[in-house]
């Protein structure tokens, strides 16, 4: 699985909107949308860390295949 599909799956499991993830991660909505849609396939570790913290998961959960 890609980062995009992992993010989408985890976000859906938590019942979080894209906007909620962006707000909790202190990132722009555009950044979250680009990652989840696969436009940005290589987000920085800082970005991944913020998203993981917002979703209450480990970075590994986002990047695992």
Feature locations, PLM:
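Short hydrophobic/aromatic patches at helix-to-coil boundaries
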Residues: 1-2, 61-65
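Short basic helix-loop element that most often maps to the first helix and adjoining turn
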Residues: 5-24
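Conserved hydrophobic/aromatic packing and binding residues within compact polymer-binding modules
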Residues: 7, 21, 32-35, 62
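Short, Lys/Arg-enriched C-terminal cap helix and immediately downstream tail that follows
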Residues: 10, 45-46
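Residue cluster at the C-terminal edge of the helix-turn-helix DNA-binding motif
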Residues: 24, 42, 53-54
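Recognition helix of helix-turn-helix/homeodomain-like DNA-binding domains
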Residues: 27-42
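DNA major-groove recognition helix of helix-turn-helix/homeodomain DNA-binding modules
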Residues: 46-61
């Amino acid at each position: 699985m890609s980062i995009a599909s992992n993010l989408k799956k985890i976000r859906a499991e938590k019942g979080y909107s894209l906007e909620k993830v962006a707000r909790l991660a202190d990132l722009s909505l555009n950044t979250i949308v680009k990652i989840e849609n696969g436009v940005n396939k290589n987000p920085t570790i800082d970005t991944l860390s913020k998203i993981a913290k917002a979703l209450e998961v480990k970075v590994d959960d986002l990047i695992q295949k």
